Amino acid sequence: MAKKDNIFKAGNFNDLPFSFNEEVTEVFEDMIDRSVPGYKSRLKLIENLGKNYYQNNSSCYDLGCSLGASTLNLLKAVGKKEGQIYAVDNSKAMISSCNSKFKNLTDSKKLDFINQDLEVIEIKDASVVVINYVLQFIESSKREKLLEKVFCGMKKNGLLILSEKTHFDNKYRNQTLFNLHHNFKSKNGYTKMEISRKRDALEGVLITDLEKDHRQRLSKIGFREIRKVMSNLNFFTLIAQK
């Protein structure tokens, strides 16, 4: 059972910017499940899409894999087919936890967890690439370059699965969805103080884009068949093909 997220309760908060350190790693499963609407449904979606788009003897990448939830669903999608899955994260704590948690799977050589910045990882022969709630933590000026590298390293007809938090250019809609997301977290047991403190910690760390900006960026790079396949409040999932 996942350890409960109490990081932002009174007495626990250190007033530092949010980071994926050991403290966050310990409670991340609980944190994301209670904070991101539709999270578990997206994981199942990754498995289903992976089954449809994985090409035999190719590679899958989970970029910004955190604790490997998406990775595990990619592994289910590939099944007994030949290929390799690379799960990459720049958090040493996250990768250390993954290597421990999935030791029986990494020993098979089919799955490889890599502690490296996404800016320097090499992408090659990829038929499925997952980027789940990751671009929002990367400097805005570097997002297009990362996606260009992904595109260049993908096989023809390869699939990108991109999930992000977003905001809206309509102020009323933006505030409405903000309030609904606040209510979602409240119903999942977070106090107003915890929600406020986490929001402050994420200030300047998590920077969202408009959905249309994501679409335009993908189209500019050369992706086609760009479609929204899931939307929950201010979180969405796009798929795009090379």
Go through each PLM region and give its residues:
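Conserved alpha-helix/loop element of class I SAM-dependent methyltransferases that forms part
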Residues: 38-56
